[in-house]
Amino acid sequence: LTDFRDASEEILPGDQVLLQRTRTGIEMLNRRYRPDGQDLFFLLHRPRRWNAGEGLWMGYERKRGKLTEFNALLRGGSRGCFSEIVGETAILPAIKYVITLDTDTQFPRDAARQLVGTMAHPLNRPQFDAQRGIVAEGYSILQPRVGVSLPSARRSWFVRLFAGDAGIEPYTREVSDVYQDEFHEGSFIGK
């Protein structure tokens, strides 16, 4: 899922070169790793749209917008919000779980298996209440605890002030989350 960076213009020099490079990379990965002829890698790119509040051309609602529009596509919605799609998308409606990674995400070995296993557990499976329009039981989003790595702990005054001590101290830093414990809900933390 990609957007171009925010800009004062809708189209910048170099946009198409970057998009073509990404397209070529995705196509190369699919040629190399395609089992049974099904694509494993996709590019879904959105164009910049004018945001009057920000006074910029940008991807609609940034990360939240990308995930919302991608989720709609997975559920059979329109492809119209994406200006460039690479990969055979027929498989997309069969996708059950989505794991989002950022450039600063640390994703240890077997973490995906553990996340999917947690979501697939019978007590965690979301039960949608169509009348109220909510997930009434279980969970539809799982977010591991957000932490600060040792290398980034001194990056800025903001990080030092709000992150506390960095590193691993499992016994002195273990805490519960009041919202999760009492209401079975959490505060989503994202970029």
Task: List each model region and its residues.
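Internal catalytic domains of large membrane-associated glycosyltransferases
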Residues: 1-191
